[in-house]
């Protein structure tokens, strides 16, 4: 079975990492990245790596994750157009944001999206197309709309709405594949957690233990 792990946030964030990493802290991003390579899955996608040079380790002289990824046989594609150019000739691939992106922690919110920004729909389509090159093996693909939760933390209803719609569009891509292969496709849509307490209003919540 071929395996793909994808998200709208960084490839080493908590939810994608839960499928391949074994670290004591979710913030050990460099080590999580090493686990990503060791897992040897076929396809990864997200905004980028959060700590590709191991900056958190004092005096570290660690090898860059991009170099290690290349040594492990992965092709790095920067954006969907670059993916389209490289996918056919690649055995294993990591899809990241275009090099022009200014924030490596996540792709832009759907409500703020500009022309050329990578979308969750593109990530989903890329994952399905890449993993289904050899259907005889079957595949598992995890797709996370990771910024729904972030927008809920900010109590930003408009942004939440657009992020959920973005996820809905990604599900439509998966459903298109299901319609072509109805007897062998299972789509599961779920939530690993939610912030809770989102209300109509303005601004994020605060924690006041003395109230």
Spans of model-derived segments:
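A post-motif C-terminal structural segment
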Residues: 10-211
């Amino acid at each position: 079975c071929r395996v793909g792990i994808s998200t709208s946030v960084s490839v080493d964030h908590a939810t994608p990492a839960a499928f391949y990493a074994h670290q004591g802290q979710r913030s050990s991003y460099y080590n999580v990245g090493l686990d990503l390579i060791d897992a040897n899955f076929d396809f990864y996608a997200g905004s980028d790596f959060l700590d590709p040079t191991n900056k958190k380790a004092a005096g570290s002289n660690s090898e860059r994750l991009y170099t290690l990824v290349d040594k492990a046989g992965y092709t790095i594609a920067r954006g969907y157009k670059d993916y389209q150019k490289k996918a056919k000739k690649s055995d294993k691939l990591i899809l990241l944001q275009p090099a022009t992106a200014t924030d490596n922690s996540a792709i832009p919110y759907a409500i703020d999206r500009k022309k050329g920004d990578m979308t969750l729909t593109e990530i989903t389509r890329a994952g399905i197309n890449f993993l289904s090159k050899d259907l005889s093996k079957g595949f598992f693909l995890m797709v996370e709309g990771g910024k729904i939760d972030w927008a809920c933390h900010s109590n930003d209803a408009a942004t939440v709405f657009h992020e959920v719609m973005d996820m809905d569009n990604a599900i439509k891509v998966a459903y298109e594949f299901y319609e072509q292969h109805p007897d062998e496709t299972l789509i599961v849509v779920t939530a690993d957690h939610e912030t809770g307490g989102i209300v109509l209003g303005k601004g994020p919540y605060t924690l006041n233990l003395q109230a």
